[in-house]
């Protein structure tokens, strides 16, 4: 279990500071604000508007606090889409920390508290139906060690700690593994907009878009296969 402390970000939502990595799980300028901007609006909603799918398969690198999964689940509740959500995590947070996070109160929708707990209580390495159109599969382990398969995913939330803190997860070999797991037409989104990262994505024949970032951050990246 990670050594973390809860922090309050500028929009009032919680994040965690990992004391060993010396980094926060989200932007200090607003955790929910960042996740909505990067992953929901510029990832999920972009993919839906471009493709009008009947189902969507999502890969998340870094389950963390469960915020991205929770926001995606909230979106799914008002959707006819079928969601299959695979999330990788190497160091799950404790039940005590989970219970202190304020996302259910912050987002404040019917059933939110129980659904947030259900996401975290889901078993590892097997599919769990959270609601009838949202199936979660949490995978415990390192991205380097987990088999992703080829052309499995429509959308990737790449939400690892930054390249300065976890350079091994931003290595071009790892990015190639992720790219191979993406279907043709798939989308990858991340808060990171480092030059080397964008060059590596382009070397994998992905079309890289540099977009305005969330408050407090100049840019983010969306990559299209």
State where each predicted segment sits:
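Core SAM-dependent methyltransferase catalytic element
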Residues: 204-225
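Conserved S-adenosyl-L-methionine
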Residues: 62-64, 89
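Conserved beta-strand signature within the Rossmann-like core of class I S-adenosyl-L-methionine
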Residues: 155-157, 184-192
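A short SAM/SAH-binding and catalytic strip from SAM-dependent methyltransferases
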Residues: 154-168
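A short glycine-rich, Lys/Arg-flanked "PGG" loop and its adjoining helix->strand segment in the class I
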Residues: 168-184
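Glycine-rich SAM-binding Motif I of class I
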Residues: 66-70
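Rossmann-like AdoMet
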Residues: 1-56, 74-107
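S-adenosyl-L-methionine
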Residues: 97-149
